[in-house]
Amino acid sequence: MRLLLPFSSPLSATSSPSTPQFIPELPPPSQFDYSGLTKILKKSVIGTLTGALSLTLVFSSPISSVAATNDPYLSVNPPSSSFESSLNHFDSAPEDCPNEEEADTEIQDDDIEPQLVTNEGIVEEAWEIVNGAFLDTRSHSWTPETWQKQKDDILASPIKSRSKAHEVIKNMLASLGDQYTRFLSPDEFSRMSKYDITGIGINLREVSDGGGNVKLKVLGLVLDSAADIAGVKQGDEILAVNGMDVSGKSSFEVSSLLQGPSKTFVVLKVKHGKCGPVKSLKIQRQVNAQTPVSYRLEKVDNGTVSVGYIRLKEFNALARKDLVIAMKRLLDKGASYFVMDLRDNLGGLVQAGIETAKLFLDEGDTVIYTAGRDPEAQKTVVSDKKPLITAPLIVMVNNRTASASEIVASALHDNCKAVLVGERTYGKGLIQSVYELRDGSGVVVTIGKYVTPNHMDINGGGIEPDFRNLPAWDEVKERLSKCSILQQS
């Protein structure tokens, strides 16, 4: 199976307050000089694929493709007392489940042991995944013929142990010359499947029911987590959060509803198995919400112009929500221009980056294209809402602006919503998938890449800024106006 995981973390996350922070003083970056603006800071849809479980990693910093984060969302209002009184009881079973015996049988079906697989079978399974999905973005020397010959040579001799099979897979993947394509031990894959961005110890996945609808299910469950203690089980379907029906919502959206400050409560309505009981569970969150957003208001031109400065350290689960709060507060204070600082932002959740970009784009604007050999990797992401602001915008970037940050910067630049100021960005625009093999191990495979709205390949070359130093706002407005005219023509 193949699963889209809309999450990740940057290389290093720093602890932050639980709400967007208003900054009283900001030291100026040495490499920029702008007299008017002073003291600015530096810085699962499921399908079938050769019997393997694939977690599509739409994320990662340029250094580490897989990392854990504990950054949750802002608080979700606790349920009312009348709602709480109905907790921790079983609701009626679905009408299409005739009796408990059948329900128990259905739940037990999820626990059927996988068939035994040979050492050669594990190697061939990994080979098939690469053969069907790998995108050679570096050497461009990969061909189906040479890959077939490599398999034939490997399987010409018996593989006598599982450890030897794993070693063969490592060497086979290393021969591709792609730093992100690699082998995962069973323990490494298990930890990844229990990756938690919800703050209560679960990892969600989107599952098609075959009829055009998508259900949200628990892919991984952290042992002794709040959800585990409350009675959530792996494979449970999520029906509602704090009384809100989550039908039609993505795993990313539902994760945002689950997150909140430590010690607050969230109410989860779940169904155990296809025909199991429905139960409402009150769960206490375990981690503190941390914001990646800080902001301040600057007065320029002798105090006649107000500029809203916003720094985004990373694109975690809080990024979009806290950015909206910060921008609204700055608008209320009279900001007529904005600076968004993405310097040293290594990325994070790609979905958070995409949703952030949409805040500035017109409905129908292209956010990003994805390209790959697999048709499922070839998509166009489009903004579906009106912009939150239309004021002139500067996006500050440097050589540590990467991944999700580059998606945001290119989307705003190519759609004539912002000018880029600073240094060429890092150039991390690849998409990896993680596939589970039948013995519990896994492989991470590069399956696609991001292409900007202007059809530029981000990976390797990065994005060149419009200006090295901060320009005057009249120059910003002129550049954006010319861009819009060219775009319309």
Curated annotation (Swiss-Prot):
Is Plastid one of the keywords UniProt gives this record? yes
Q: From its record, what is one biological process in GO terms?
A: proteolysis
Gene behind this protein: CTPA1
Subcellular localization(s) per the UniProt record: Plastid, Chloroplast thylakoid lumen
Q: What is the lineage of its organism?
A: Eukaryota, Viridiplantae, Streptophyta, Embryophyta, Tracheophyta
Pfam families, per the entry:
PDZ_6, Peptidase_S41
Q: Which CDD domains match?
A: cpPDZ_CPP-like (cd06782), Peptidase_S41_CPP (cd07560)
Question: Which GO cellular component does the record give, naming just one?
Answer: chloroplast thylakoid lumen
Protein name according to UniProt: Carboxyl-terminal-processing peptidase 1, chloroplastic
Q: Quote the biased-composition stretches of kind Low complexity, using this chain's numbering.
A: 1-20
Q: State the reactions this protein catalyses.
A: The enzyme shows specific recognition of a C-terminal tripeptide, Xaa-Yaa-Zaa, in which Xaa is preferably Ala or Leu, Yaa is preferably Ala or Tyr, and Zaa is preferably Ala, but then cleaves at a variable distance from the C-terminus. A typical cleavage is -Ala-Ala-|-Arg-Ala-Ala-Lys-Glu-Asn-Tyr-Ala-Leu-Ala-Ala
Q: Which family does it belong to?
A: Belongs to the peptidase S41A family.
